UniProtKB/Swiss-Prot annotation:
Residues 1449-1562 form the RdRp catalytic domain. It catalyses: ATP + H2O = ADP + phosphate + H(+); RNA(n) + a ribonucleoside 5'-triphosphate = RNA(n+1) + diphosphate. The replicase large subunit is translated as a fusion protein by episodic readthrough of a termination codon. When readthrough of the terminator codon TGA occurs between the codons for 1187-Lys and 1189-Arg, this results in the addition of the RdRp region. The keyword Transcription does not apply. Residues 1034-1187 form the (+)RNA virus helicase C-terminal domain. This is Replicase large subunit. Residues 872-1033 form the (+)RNA virus helicase ATP-binding domain. GO terms for molecular function: ATP binding; ATP hydrolysis activity; mRNA methyltransferase activity; RNA binding; RNA helicase activity; RNA-directed RNA polymerase activity. Heterodimer of a large and a small subunit. It comes from Tobacco rattle virus (strain SYM). Signal peptide: none annotated. Residues 601-622 form a coiled coil. Residues 86-300 form the Alphavirus-like MT domain. Residues 65-425 are annotated as: Methyltransferase.
Length: 1707
């Protein structure tokens, strides 16, 4: 490892380990090398060493001869990781590290220069260039002082040594080295092509040109510009025509603020004094470097500079250690007028002052006893701890000894969150004593001020009780006014008068004081002030002045007499983190520059301008005359308004607004009326692309042949390259013999229905195209429905202005005021929606949007009477509407074309095959993506095809929008990634292109066409199985061998690779998105759009430049290195399917790192491939022979039977061992301090639309409560304190982590379909009651059920209905953490559950209404639908007893995550329809809709406010029932519940029993795309519902609580006392009585094994659990009191316990 120059932190992430983990790691490596884990660690280290050596071998070596310590070698590799550094350690130097660093910096500068260009090295490293054979570099090495002479001698000696080594055969020299060495043979000190001893400005080694010295276009300067005046450098660059100088200098930005500081990377320092700046090395007696400060500052600030008509621009591009690498560009020909007023701004950051504070410390000069102040830089964390400690000391404890003791003990080690952390910036012991004095005095000064503050507050709050108090206040107020008036006017008018009162005192003082008259004259204004304030003080005005006026006078006097005292002297401040530069370019121009040298001659400019305009006019006339026969043009020339005199020059010319160039305009004489010529002109311009290209090309050729001056014509396209024109293309009709009028697909109508499915014809090409048109129309209708819903909500006031984070990117533009009512997040939408208010129904039109600087500049139609327009996500791009418009005019007969498929694995060269086989001049080439199309164009261009490639190679969308007229045809159509498109789209492309043969490139195992409308069922979307010829390609050029091993499982035939990389994939487990490794320039890939959004925000926040795309977006792309990221723990059945796995793992050529929060199929595949040996991977290379591989599969059957009595056996140890076997490691995790650590350490949160209130919130951690101690250790979380940080964490992880719907949904149609199914399947229509809810008895019953506190709050609130803000909610978090039965508690910090609830008055309004509605729903529900509401365990068992134990069922569980947070507008509208079905009034429905649309939540306890849209509020009047309705509706929509035997549901839990063999489609994809639910479907041997197993006994089905969850909760640490434990015992004993039946116990054992993947038997542990549950005495043995003593079961009031336990007791 030492020879390879690797650090241990490079081999393993040791820096990320804790101290304990690091210790264990080294112990295993060193003491137990033969154990399994020790051998595994050795293999990891060896593999990483091999990988690093292999990677290092690919880089060119850089030999460092200087002798460096291991620490310096590590530092060098850390600062310059791109180099393969080889340390020879054979050359001792004074500053070895600095010399080695200069070599690497020189190579970095040289890398900025093109490889074949000559370079001038200013100050030069010529001996280094000789050793590398860089013959293109000429070094200018002037000997300006003795140090330079010494260096030159050293270099000559080094060169001589190289020659000696070459002659003795010890060194091999390349041809370039020999050539460079030959330059020195005659005279080693003479100038030559390699180097000279001249300055850069005086060097003539490259000769002369036009009497001026020649130089290279590129120059480098390595630490040589310090003494090079900037003006001289600019003059030399102008003379030698050098374009750019790449330079390196020591960079000390803090020198602008502080005179002395360190340079830690080189172990050096800087010091500034007497107009010079000194650079030196610490602990080094050699001479320092002295440079002019003003010149150094010019390079440090890097301001743009103008010189001799050139602008010199500074570009700092990197900081390495303490060295700044920058470039100076010479920009010629910049028009000064355009720069004269431009402002620029930048910051120079000072990284070394990060996390530091500046503390003033004081000392006494021994000789004069004068107090001296200086600033001390201290680590902020250290200072915060010290200030916090001192503030908590009492007045008696506040002594210097206590302060010194605490500072000394924490100077080297800080205890943070219970762990010892080394203080990196420790304070010097001498300064520490002075720091203690400062902190002590600061606290002593602060405490009286705080006491005065408290007294002032008490005085202000003291009531006035007597007439004396009133008169005293009035008198004091009048005196204050008089004193303030004197103070304000005294300095100007009254001083002269008042000084006359004391003339004798002033004269006496001047006479008796030495030099009195002189002092009185010099300080006359000070004397007047003293006299004036004496008068004011004499009349008592000083104490009566207003506080701000008195403070202002004090400040002026202190400034006047240079007095610096007060508490502010002790303030601890943050150091400056950056130095700001803010200037104008106009300051760069010197008035001394002459106009003749800077600007061209004005007469010459005028002549050239006239000639250019005349040429343009003639070309335009000729072109228009050839195009239009009735056109004739003439030029009308106007003279300039004034003649510009030649006497003006320089700045005078720049600052005067004059017309320099001649103006000209083109006039047109028409032979016909204006409308006719305009119509004809436009019809000629908007022609087919081919016709325009031919005319322009022919005309350009004629102009080039006939124009003697060589002027060329540049015709710019209307659409910039790389962007497709999204506006409607005017096209001729395609269908012959009929006139097609464009259907208005841009009209938006309310109440539109989804189109009917087309009739099946039997011809696949016809059916696929019809279906594609049907799909496009359905997408249009769904988008119209979403647009109309936003329009309705805004017009009805449900969506209001002033909110944030509006749904669907909503923006509302006020047409009259021309401003945004609601500003969208993004602009530049292609279309805007303009409502049409002339009609009674909801309607409008999509109009083409015209943008200017984020504002709409359309002239909207006045006749529609709309005062606002709307933009949203659905109006951003409307390409599919244009495509639908174009394709609807085509005939849909059978397509006469043969279709071929090249079915290839990822990276097999499908695009290369197109480039090699297609001729774009005669074939049509299409691709589904813009990037892939550009790549094809670039590769075709490299082969030199003579045709217009952008006309022949297009994206599919561009082809369907612009080429339906037949302008692009060919016998052969090449279609890249054809399987990603709808089959109808492929058929349309073949029809339009007139192709006889369509060659499709694709992969049947990768991502196919995905519809964006979830409600359409597509039957003809795929071409798989419809191809005439299928050619398989199973050799990949992209994927490494381990990826080929994964792909081989999913493809027919053997997958082989040409990539020489064997192992390329690794898995990195992360806890959250915060731990994603952020690498500049990396390619990140995510599965979901929501994950992409999170990652983009994270990269933007950390200012890391990298690309992010989803797996779907990256299909067809190739990257060298990929970071695949999963930040969502929930499983998405669509985005995490097999096809996504294949695409995700096959995008890279070198490496892939999968960073995931959860183990899944992707990580499993990666780990399995990583476990393959080299021999196993060898078979996947193309060169290896194919090896046969056989696998065996076994089916395992289990059957247990034999009931008997449950024995009274088992111990606490049995329970603990069983739990540890189920969840290894959970019992070792102590979470008691988790909440405290989170509250007291830094936490980075990204929250949108949240307002927090800072303040001294109650220290909840000071509250001490005593609880019983559990004997069993489980992962049952501790109670947490509900702090502000916990509130924000819960908001981020729950309310702001809701998924976004990615597809279009026609909400109106889906609601109608769902309501229809509810009536036919769930409810008995005859029992549905829809009469108005006016039941007074129901209201009174609800009122009686409320507590007296709630009744008092409602009665005290006297607001009317219109005064209540229904959209405002309270927000709180629960202190109890939901226990988890998996391994996540070991590494995951769970967020607390949030409760969002209305105030009591609103609940009193809606509570009785929803109670009545829910009773009506239960009365009308079919009997086999079991709604788990207000049911005990026995009630639930009674409802499922009808299930036949002899019948076979398929039980289906649907697990939904983030359920109530996934609600959107559609869910709200559906819920309102259900309420209306059971009698809800419209006024109440409107109030409920308003209260759930645009809402504000406030956490008053913790000072937080947030904005939330549509989410189901977890504490409103109908939370549980509304969630249950949504679950039922979603399952009803996507599953055949009409076939179900039993449907049990409640909240987000559900269990459905189907007859065995019932066929249905996995509902999870539709639940995700239509209902916005992230879910998983389970089919276990034993189903579970609401934490209870549904067990089949000999006589019936029975729900039994999950014993694992029961045992987990027995580790609860918040049970107060034995009385509380008795209440828990009653509840436990009642709900777990089934454990007394051994038949249940045996079934439970199987259930646990099936659910938790437990391989052992659980009967013994279940027996032990029942033993401790059935007896309260045994239960008491599971806990100890606060003194760690056994509990006394006799100390229980059982009557009180029985009263406390209700039917729904939750412990």
């Amino acid at each position: 490892m030492a020879n390879g120059n690797f650090k241990l932190s490079q081999l393993l992430n040791v820096d990320e380990m804790s101290a304990e983990q690091r210790s264990h790691f080294f112990d295993l490596m060193l003491t137990k090398p033969d154990c399994e884990i020790g051998q595994m660690m050795q293999r990891v280290v060896v593999d990483k060493v091999d990988d690093m050596i292999r990677e290092r071998k690919t880089k060119d070596p850089v030999i460092v001869h200087e002798v460096l310590s291991q620490k310096e070698q590590n530092k060098l590799m850390e600062i310059y990781p791109e180099f393969n550094i080889v340390f020879k350690d054979d050359k001792n130097m004074v500053h070895g590290f600095a010399a080695a660093e200069r070599k690497l910096q020189a190579l970095l500068l040289l890398d900025r220069v093109p490889a074949l260009q000559e370079v001038d090295d200013i100050g030069g490293q010529w001996s280094f260039w000789v050793t590398r054979g860089e013959k293109r570099i000429h070094s200018c090495c002037p000997n300006l002082d003795i140090r330079d002479d010494q260096r030159e001698i050293s270099r000559q000696i080094f060169l001589t040594a190289i020659g000696d080594q070459a002659r003795s055969g010890k060194r091999q020299m390349s041809e370039n080295e020999l050539w460079m060495y030959d330059q020195f043979r005659k005279n080693i000190a003479a100038p030559n092509a390699v180097r000279c001893n001249n300055t850069y400005q005086g060097c003539t080694c490259r000769g002369f040109s036009d009497g001026k010295k020649k130089g290279a276009q590129y120059a480098i300067a390595l630490h040589s510009l310090y003494d090079f005046k900037l003006k001289d450098l600019m003059a030399t660059m102008v003379e030698k025509k050098t374009k750019v100088v790449h330079a390196a200098m020591l960079f000390a930005p803090e020198s602008m603020l502080v005179d002395e500081g360190p340079l830690p990377s080189v172990d050096g320092y800087y010091m500034k004094k007497n107009g010079k700046i000194y650079f030196g090395f610490e602990k080094d007696p050699s001479f320092s470097y002295i440079h002019d400060w003003e010149e150094y500052k010019k390079y440090l600030l890097g301001k743009p500079v103008s010189y001799q008509g050139n602008v010199f621009y500074f570009e700092p591009w990197q900081v390495r250690g303490d060295t700044m690498l920058f470039s100076i560009y010479r920009i010629a020909g910049v028009p000064r007028r355009s720069l004269s007023s431009q402002e620029y701004y930048r910051r120079i950051y000072i990284s070394r002052w990060e996390n530091m504070v500046v503390v003033p410390i004081f000392d006494l000069v021994e000789s004069t006893r004068e107090l001296v102040k200086k600033d001390l830089f201290v680590e902020k964390q250290f200072m915060d701890k010290c200030l916090d400690y001192i503030a908590r000391l009492s007045d008696q404890q506040l002594t210097i000894s206590n302060v010194k003791s605490y500072l000394s003990s924490n100077n080297w080690v800080l205890f943070i969150n219970g762990a010892a952390v080394k203080n990196k910036q420790s304070v010097d012991s001498r300064d520490l004593q002075l720091l203690a004095q400062t902190l002590l005095v600061k606290e002593q000064v602060a405490r009286p001020v705080m006491r005065e503050l408290r007294e002032a507050i008490l005085t202000e709050t003291k009531p006035i009780t007597s007439l004396t108090d009133v008169l005293g206040l009035i008198s004091r107020k009048l005196w204050k006014q008089f004193a303030n008036k004197i103070a304000v006017g005294g300095f100007v008018g009254m001083v002269g008068t008042l000084i006359g009162f004391y003339p004798k005192k002033v004269l006496t003082w001047a006479k008796d004081t030495p030099n009195g008259p002189e002092l009185c004259y010099e300080n006359s204004h000070k004397t007047k002030v003293i006299v004036f304030l004496s008068v004011v003080y004499a009349i008592g005005g000083i104490t009566l002045m207003r506080r701000d006026i008195r403070d202002g006078l004090v400040k002026k006097l202190c400034d006047m007499f240079d007095i610096k005292r007060g508490a502010h002297v002790l303030d601890v401040e943050n150091p400056c983190r950056y130095y700001e530069i803010n200037d104008f370019f106009s300051s760069l121009y010197s008035a001394s520059e002459s106009g003749e040298t800077v600007l061209p001659d004005l007469s010459e400019v005028k002549a050239k301008s006239d000639k250019l305009l005349q040429q343009k006019k003639e070309i335009a006339d000729e072109f228009l005359s050839a195009k239009f026969s009735n056109y004739s043009g003439s030029s009308v020339r106007t003279s300039p308004p004034s003649v510009v005199g030649s006497s003006r020059s320089g700045l005078g010319l720049l600052l005067e607004d004059s017309n320099v160039l001649t103006q000209a305009r083109v006039g047109v004489s028409r032979k016909v009326d204006d409308e006719e010529i305009m119509e004809q002109f436009l019809s000629g311009l908007i022609d087919t692309e081919a016709e325009i290209d031919e005319v322009v090309s022919a005309f350009s050729a004629e102009c080039e042949r006939g124009e003697t001056s060589g002027t060329k014509v540049l015709c710019k396209p209307l659409t910039p390259p790389g962007f497709e024109n999204v506006l409607p293309a005017v096209k001729p009709l395609v269908s012959k013999g009929k006139t097609v009028k464009r259907v208005d697909y841009f009209q938006v109508m309310g109440g539109e229905r989804l189109p009917k499915r087309p009739v099946v014809s039997g011809d696949n090409s016809v059916d696929a195209r019809r279906e594609f048109l049907y799909y496009l129309d359905a997408e249009r209708v769904a988008q119209n429905d979403e647009i109309m819903s936003l329009y309705r909500d805004y017009s009805r006031g449900v969506i209001r202005t002033g909110g944030q984070n509006y749904p669907h990117g909503l923006g509302v533009w006020d047409v009259e005021m021309k401003n945004w009512c609601i500003r969208p997040v993004v602009t530049e939408h292609a279309y805007v929606f303009q409502p049409d208010k002339r009609m009674d129904d909801w309607s409008g039109y999509l109009e083409v949007a015209v943008w200017e600087r984020g504002m709409l500049v359309n002239d909207f139609a006045v006749e529609r009477m709309s005062d606002y327009v709307i933009v949203c996500d659905q109006t951003y791009l409307c390409n599919n509407r244009l495509i639908l418009d174009n394709l609807s005019a085509l005939d849909l007969g059978p397509v006469n074309c043969s279709f071929e498929l090249v079915d290839g694995v990822p990276g097999c060269g499908k695009s290369t095959m197109i480039v090699n086989s297609a001729n774009p001049c005669v074939d049509v080439v299409l691709s589904t993506g813009r990037a892939a199309t550009d790549d094809l164009i670039e590769r075709f261009a490299s082969k030199g095809f003579p045709c217009k490639l952008k006309r022949r190679v297009k994206t599919v969308d561009s082809f369907l929008m612009h080429c339906v007229d037949g302008s692009l045809t060919g016998d052969v159509l090449h279609f890249d990634e054809a399987l990603m498109a709808h089959a109808g789209m492929v058929y349309f492309c073949a029809q339009i292109a007139g192709a006889k043969r369509c060659i499709c490139q694709g992969d049947q195992n990768q991502i196919s066409f995905k519809p964006r409308v979830s409600q359409v069922d597509l039957r003809f979307s795929s071409l798989v199985g419809k191809f005439d010829i299928v050619t398989e390609k199973r050799e990949t050029y992209r994927s490494p061998a381990d990826v080929a091993a994964v792909l081989n499982k999913y493809y027919t035939g053997d997958v082989r690779t040409h990539n020489a990389t064997a192992n390329s994939m690794t898995v990195r487990k992360i806890v959250s998105k915060e731990q994603v490794s952020l690498k500049p320039g990396a390619q990140y890939i995510t599965f979901l759009q929501s994950e992409k959004k999170e990652l983009v925000n994270l990269l933007a926040l950390r200012k890391v430049a990298a690309k992010v795309s989803t797996v779907h977006e990256s299909q067809g792309e190739t990257f060298k290195d990929v970071v695949l990221v999963r930040t969502k723990p929930t499983d998405d059945s669509i985005a995490r399917g097999r096809e996504y796995l294949i695409v995700a793992l096959s995008r890279h050529t070198q490496s892939l790192v999968y960073e995931t929060v959860k183990e899944d199929d992707v990580s499993k595949e990666i780990r399995e491939s990583a476990a393959l040996t080299k021999a196993a991977l060898a078979r996947f290379f193309v060169t290896e022979t194919v090896l046969x591989r056989f696998r065996s599969r076994f089916d395992v059957f289990r059957h247990h039977e034999g009931p008997c009595a449950v024995p009274d056996s088992g111990t606490i140890t049995d329970l603990e061992m069983w739990y540890d076997a189920l969840f290894p490691g959970n019992s070792l995790r102590d979470s008691s301090l988790d909440g405290y650590l989170v509250a007291t350490t830094d936490c980075n949160l990204r929250l949108d639309n949240v307002t927090i209130k800072s303040g001294n919130w109650k220290d909840k951690f000071a509250e001490k409560e005593t609880f019983l101690k559990p004997v069993i250790r489980t992962a049952m979380p501790d109670k947490r304190k509900t702090t502000q940080l916990e509130s924000l964490l819960a908001l981020q992880k729950r309310n702001q982590a809701a998924p976004d719907l990615q597809e279009n949904v026609h909400a109106t149609v889906l609601i109608e379909e769902t309501m229809k199914k509810l009536k036919s399947v769930v409810y008995d229509v005859g029992k549905i009651r829809a009469d108005p809810i006016v039941n007074r008895a129901q209201m009174e019953r609800w009122w009686r059920n409320q507590s007296t506190a709630v009744q008092a709050k409602v009665v005290a609130d006297v607001r009317e209905l219109h005064e209540i803000d229904y959209s405002s909610y309270m927000y709180m978090i629960k202190s109890d953490v939901k226990p988890k039965t998996d391994l996540t508690p070991q590494f995951e910090y769970s967020a607390l559950q949030t409760v969002v609830y209305h105030e009591k008055l609103i609940n009193s309004l809606f509570g009785p209404i929803f109670k009545e509605i829910n009773e009506r729903k239960l009365d009308a529900m079919q009997p086999h639908f079991v709604f788990n509401t207000r049911m005990t365990s026995s009630d639930l068992n009674d409802r499922v007893k009808f299930l036949n134990t002899e019948a076979a069922y398929d039980f289906v569980e649907i697990d939904m995550s983030k359920f109530d947070k996934s609600a959107n507008r559609f869910h709200l509208q559906l819920q309102l329809e259900i309420y209306r079905l059971f009698g809800l009034d419209e006024w109440a429905a409107f109030l409920w809709e308003v209260s759930h649309t645009q809402t504000t939540v406030r956490d008053i306890q913790n000072g937080m406010m947030a904005h939330i849209w549509y989410q189901q509020k977890s504490g409103d009047a109908d939370t549980y029932n509304a969630n249950s309705d949504r679950t039922l509706c979603a399952l009803l929509s996507e599953l055949p519940l009409e076939k179900a035997v039993m449907v049990t549901y409640g909240g987000d839990d559900s269990l459905i029993a189907f007859p065995r063999g019932t066929q249905f489609v996995d509902p999870c994809p539709k639940l995700a795309t239509k209902w916005n639910f992230e879910c998983k479907i389970f089919k276990y041997d034993v189903p579970m519902f609401c934490g209870k197993f549904l067990l089949k006994t000999s006589s019936c089905y029975e729900f039994v609580p999950d014993p694992v969850k029961v045992l987990t909760k027995l580790g609860k640490k918040s049970i107060k006392d034995v009385q509380h434990l008795a209440e828990i015992y009653i509840s436990l004993n009642d709900s777990n009585r089934a454990l007394g039946n051994y038949m249940v116990v045996s079934k439970l054992s199987e259930s646990v094994s099936d659910r938790y993947l437990y391989k052992g038997d659980s009967v013994h542990a279940l027996c032990a659990l029942w033993k401790h549950i059935k007896s309260f005495t045994a239960l008491c043995t599971l806990f100890r009191d606060e003194n760690d003593k056994e509990l006394n079961p006799a100390k229980v009031d059982w009557k009180k316990a029985q009263r406390a336990v209700s039917n729904f007791y939750d412990w």
